[in-house]
UniProtKB/Swiss-Prot annotation:
It catalyses: an N-acyl-L-homoserine lactone + H2O = an N-acyl-L-homoserine + H(+). Optimum pH is 8.0. Little or no activity below pH 4.2. This is N-acyl homoserine lactonase. InterPro entries: AB_hydrolase_1, AB_hydrolase_fold, AB_hydrolase_sf. GO terms for biological process: acylglycerol catabolic process. It comes from Microbacterium testaceum (strain StLB037).
Amino acid sequence: MILAHDVSGSGPLLVLLHGITEDRRSWDPVDFTDGFTVVRVDLRGHGASAAEEPYDIPTLATDVHDTLAQLAENDVIPGELPVIVGHSMGGIVATAYGALFPARAIVNVDQPLQLAGMQGQVQQAEGMLRGADFPLFIHGMFAQMAGGLDAEELARVNGIRSPRQDVVLGMWRPLLEDSPEELAALVSGLTRIPEDVPYLVITGLDAGPEYAAWLQREIPQAVQEVWQPPTHYPHLVDPARFVERVEAFVR
């Protein structure tokens, strides 16, 4: 699928992937255009992109790759390896991109990759997710993680959020239906990033020392940073710091 997108700036190629239920506008405060050709996309089932099964992570990563390939073929963007930056579920898609396709670097913003804990939480909420209380669950979940955002920015992000039940259920199908062993095998495949591809994790919600050790085993070159204040949105709490850090990491 060719995704809805916008392109701005000039320089090396950098791609921004939003989180689940959001769209590319979530990146509005984060300006990389002084130093990069920036491509922002709406992932499948989000924003202006088509809502069409399947919604598995490898398919979402392939959509991004196909969109970039078409843009490069049409000389809209430079034909070079991209820096892929993903927030939340977009961080998993960015990671999968690095496992499936050549990339210059991967940046994962506040998305743990060891999904066993998330699987338990999602399965406990399965009734709400599949029922009429779906919007209530989604808004409540993100409200708990929005620390650090001022009232204006929180209202902006919430105004972008557009939960589609079929899309969320499709993206979370492995969490709802796979065994723990099947989920672990899926994650193992998605984290097979070549060791010469730099991998940066910026998180506002500390997943703890056991997770940090697990990630170092899965992606040995990973650089992990925990920013304050505690939040799911470190890139929106301090966009200038985020841009500066990513620029320094990939230069």
